[in-house]
Amino acid sequence: MANLFKNILDSLKLTDDEDLDDYDDYVSELEEKERRKTERQEQRQAVKQEKRTFPSQRPAFSEEAPTSSSSKLSAASGSSDFADLRKERSQRMEKTNVSKVVPIRNPQKGLEVCIMKPTSFEDSQDICDMLLSGRAAVINLEGFDVDLAQRVMDFISGAVYSLNGKLHQISSYIFIISPDSVDISGDYLDLIRQNGFEVPTLNKDF
């Protein structure tokens, strides 16, 4: 009976040991599952951390953005500089074109025509001095002594001939003389004939 009870206890003990072993196995499996779960979570956390830190590990992209913006700014500034240069060039061209505009006829300064009415023979020298200075002179001999007027015209005619000047008659007693550099045109009697120079002869009946 005692042995039977002992056997029963042993069987119960054995049964308890098996249950304990099963429990231990169950706990071990749970721990293994927890460990694997923890490892997977850690791996996921590591992956997430890598994903979070990945943009910060790309300085090239973050630096390229300001580079592109700076390139845009430089392009904009370059275009504005080009516009300024083109405007300045057009202004220079306008100034050059304005400076190249030349009037068709420039007024000749210094050209002078003197009107002389001699009262003596000495005035003929003053008339010749005007011719030497490159000025034209109008000689009015009206009311002057005819013989004296002829002497004056003889003197002036010699000066005109020696200087290769021009002598023209406007009326019977009005003449105009000019140096070779001054041309005179108009409706008058030319005292220089085609065959040479002729000294004017005044009307004795004046």
From Swiss-Prot:
Tell me the keywords, alphabetical order.
Answer: Cell cycle, Cell division, Cytoplasm, Septation
**Would you say which domain of life the source belongs to?**
Bacteria
- Main localization is cytoplasm
Question: Would you name any one GO CC term?
Answer: cytoplasm
Specify where the region named Disordered lies, as residue ranges. Answer: 31-81
Name the GO terms of the biological process aspect: division septum assembly; FtsZ-dependent cytokinesis
* HAMAP family membership: SepF
Q: How does it assemble?
A: Homodimer. Interacts with FtsZ.
Q: Name the PANTHER family on file.
A: CELL DIVISION PROTEIN SEPF
- Please report which protein family the annotation says this sequence is part of: Belongs to the SepF family.
- The name under which this protein is listed is Cell division protein SepF
* The organism of origin for this protein: Lachnoclostridium phytofermentans (strain ATCC 700394 / DSM 18823 / ISDg)
> Mind giving the lineage of the organism this protein is from?
Bacteria, Bacillati, Bacillota, Clostridia, Lachnospirales
